[in-house]
Regions:
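Eukaryotic helix-grip
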Residues: 1-192
Length: 192
């Protein structure tokens, strides 16, 4: 995996980007990314994840995520609007943007006021996929910059390492036969 951080003009917190090549078909990677409820199994410090409107489908949908705080920092949460599209070159792009009006502020957490992230899934051949994660956010509340930047540096590496392990599970590796009906339907919308 290749990892990059960058300064964002006007912000103290760095943006990050992680790039890896997975020994898995793009269908499997996409099925994993679309399985919102399973995100805590592979996304660094994700405590819980759920769809806010499961009937909306995966082209445009809303999620609620809770990210575990590192002591002594409180947990963070964010409601996001996500969309998925296929580019002319075949890459599939899943984009998420924080939307404060999707869900009232919860007492459990500090609300993340700004977050933008993109997953780009690109089939290299039948058994290999390039996966690119880019994220820029503001963690909200009072948070020491060194903690925020430490998490920003660890998140892409640890998340991509966990994706590499998780995508081997039958629900994703064999999405067409052992995956959920929802996962099969979702990946079936795209050309690989």
């Amino acid at each position: 995996s290749d990892l990059y951080t960058a300064r964002v003009p006007g912000q103290e917190l760095r943006a990050f980007r992680g790039v890896t090549v997975l020994p898995a078909p793009a269908r499997s990677v996409l099925a994993l990314l679309a399985d919102v409820e399973n995100m805590p199994s592979w996304f660094f410090h994700m405590k819980s994840a759920r769809e806010l409107d499961p009937s909306a489908g995966h082209y445009g949908h809303n999620h609620y995520l809770v990210i575990a705080g590192i002591w002594p920092v409180r947990d963070r949460d964010v409601a996001i609007r996500a969309s998925t599209s296929q580019q002319a070159d075949g890459a599939i792009v899943m984009s998420s943007v924080a939307q404060a009006n999707l869900l009232a502020v919860q007492s459990c957490c500090v609300r993340i006021p700004r977050m933008e992230s993109t997953w780009t899934v690109r089939a290299l051949d039948a058994g290999h996929t390039e996966l690119v994660l880019t994220t820029s956010s503001h963690p909200g509340g009072s948070l020491p910059l060194w903690i925020a930047n430490m998490v920003a540096a660890d998140m892409p590496r640890k998340t991509l390492e966990a994706v590499r392990r998780e995508v081997k599970k039958p629900a994703y590796a064999e999405v067409d036969t052992q995956g959920s009906a929802k996962g099969r339907e979702f990946v079936g919308r795209f050309k690989f």
